[in-house]
UniProtKB/Swiss-Prot annotation:
Subunit-level organization: Forms homodimers. Interacts with ubiquitin-protein ligase UBE3A/E6-AP; this interaction stimulates UBE3A ubiquitin activity. Interacts with host TP53 and EP300; this interaction inhibits TP53 activity.
Molecular-function GO terms, alphabetical: DNA binding; zinc ion binding
Name this polypeptide is given: Protein E6
Record SUPFAM superfamilies: E6 C-terminal domain-like
GO-annotated cellular components: host cell cytoplasm; host cell nucleus
Zinc finger (unnamed): 31-67, 104-140
Family, as annotated: Belongs to the papillomaviridae E6 protein family.
Sequence intervals crossing the membrane: none
Domain of life (superkingdom): Viruses
Name of the gene encoding the protein in the UniProt record: E6
Subcellular localization(s) per the UniProt record: Host cytoplasm; Host nucleus
Pfam families assigned: E6 (PF00518)
């Protein structure tokens, strides 16, 4: 993998597979934090979440599900700035919500329009973390509710 220059290194798992003649199914990639190989499901989830490949010493890394959520929580604790309703997010950015890529604060999946609409309809605030507006996807929002149930 050392044959690629920094400017031409693949940024997505799809590009990485294409460049090296692999498929997502047979891609073996390590977690940037724990160094374990991602499972097939984690590779597909990473691709689905449209996350970028991290390069260290000309070697590609991704993030396993546990480390991604764990580090997202740490990032939120360290870098949380404020929460705001949708109209404040639109006013501050100058863009409509549907024009913005807002990720889930836990799993980093880009929120769908229906997930953004849920924030609007329920009056749920978005969080400004590390200079990015974040929210909660349907899956992670469900996990929070499950923890509160008896």
């Amino acid at each position: 993998m050392s044959g690629t220059s920094a400017s031409s290194q693949p940024r997505t798992l799809y590009q990485l597979c294409k460049e090296f003649g692999l498929t997502l199914r047979n891609l073996q990639i390590s977690c940037i934090w724990c160094k374990k190989h991602l499972t097939g499901a984690e590779v597909l989830a990473y691709h689905f979440k449209d996350l970028v490949v991290v390069w260290r010493k000309d070697f590609p890394y991704a993030a396993c599900a546990f480390c991604l959520e764990f580090n997202s929580k740490i990032c939120a604790l360290r870098h949380y700035e404020r929460s705001a309703f949708w109209y404040t997010v639109e006013k501050e950015t100058g863009l409509l919500l549907e024009e913005q890529q807002i990720r889930c604060a836990l799993c980093q999946k880009p929120l769908s329009q229906s997930e953004k609409n849920h924030h609007i309809d329920t009056g749920t605030r978005f969080q400004f973390i590390l200079c990015q507006w974040t929210g909660r996807c349907t899956h992670c929002r469900g996990q929070c509710v499950e923890r509160r149930l008896p």
